[in-house]
Amino acid sequence: MTSLHLKKFRRIVVKVGSSLLIDSDAGEVRAAWLSALADDIAGLHGEGRDVLIVSSGSIALGRSKLKLPRGPLKLEESQAAAAVGQIALARIWSKVLGDHGIGAGQILVTLQDTEERRRYLNARSTIAKLLDWRAVPVINENDTVATNEIRYGDNDRLAARVATMASADLLILLSDIDGLYDAPPHLNPDAKLIPVVKRVTADIEAMAGSAASELSRGGMQTKIEAAKIATTAGTHMLIASGKIEHPLRAVMDGGRCTWFMTPANPVTARKRWIAGSLEPKGTLTIDAGAVAALRAGKSLLPAGVIRVDGQFARGDAVIVRGPNTHEIGRGLVAYDAVDAEKIKGRSSCDAAQILGISGRAEMIHRDDLVVGGPRGGAG
């Protein structure tokens, strides 16, 4: 499918499940396979693309190192096994990426980190900085503190949330099956692979049977749920086989997979959400120079703010008005109302000294800002 190629995407999230990473019989990492995957990732990285990894495996690795018997684990046993396995998992990814001169940064998240706005922004900022430094974030659910009531439950949906958080334009779910079929292929030899899903409909959801393995918590149903999350937020998704060596290279060479399409890009979808779905908690009035900068696609700096109104927290939506009080746009503010009042009209360097912390240089980053009206003018 020539119109869909990995080279078209600038920021890619790759999800690797436990059943691919760990040899279930030996309880060890599939080293040769992982090395081949790291080669693929290094190739994308070397072309200037941002790559993020969502990796399962901490519980399975911990269970192996602790020599725990097969079978279900109690919650506290899973949490303790994850504590051991997370160290091993981080070391493994650091080694295979380090062999290519790429730094790896471990990020452990919980459900609340994507549901609670301030924690979401903190996680997103960390991911953005790692990518700025050309490191590869390696992300997993923090199974040591997650409970049955407050967890993602599988890394397919976690990967979709991470893709949304990172404004990725492609999510790749490596699986033990090479895509979505119109019937269970292990039961029906005539089952046909569906190469492209333009929209997740009830019929598509009905095709997702139960295909979970002992090591992983995910199946095709969770992958369809992930597709709904990702495509709604503006991220394309594909399911491809991870059982082969160099699975990403295989996709690039036209290998079998299923693409889930999105009608919008991540930035467009995100900005539509900011503009239309969030209730503004306050107002920032800015000078004419800042209006021109915003309409030229720049971020809003503290120096351009002349008035702060309302009670808002970091990450809340605010209205941005020009000096004549006309609305210029809306955005997610990087400081709460108290700190914004302290640093309005000041340089970013002065703002850091005033607050006693080295926070974000921008009052509102351009990725968090929706500007309306024609370019130019004072608003």
Swiss-Prot record:
UniProt KW keywords: Amino-acid biosynthesis, ATP-binding, Cytoplasm, Kinase, Nucleotide-binding, Proline biosynthesis, Transferase
A cellular component term, taken from the record's GO annotations: cytosol
CDD domains: AAK_G5K_ProB, PUA_G5K
Molecular function (Gene Ontology), one example: glutamate 5-kinase activity
Gene behind the chain: proB
Protein name per the record: Glutamate 5-kinase
Annotated PROSITE patterns: GLUTAMATE_5_KINASE, PUA
Family stated for the protein in its record: Belongs to the glutamate 5-kinase family.
Protein's cellular compartments: Cytoplasm
Lineage, highest ranks first: Bacteria, Pseudomonadati, Pseudomonadota, Alphaproteobacteria, Hyphomicrobiales
Enzyme class label: transferase
Binding residue positions for ATP: 15, 175-176
Top-level taxon of the source organism: Bacteria
Residue ranges of the TM segments: none
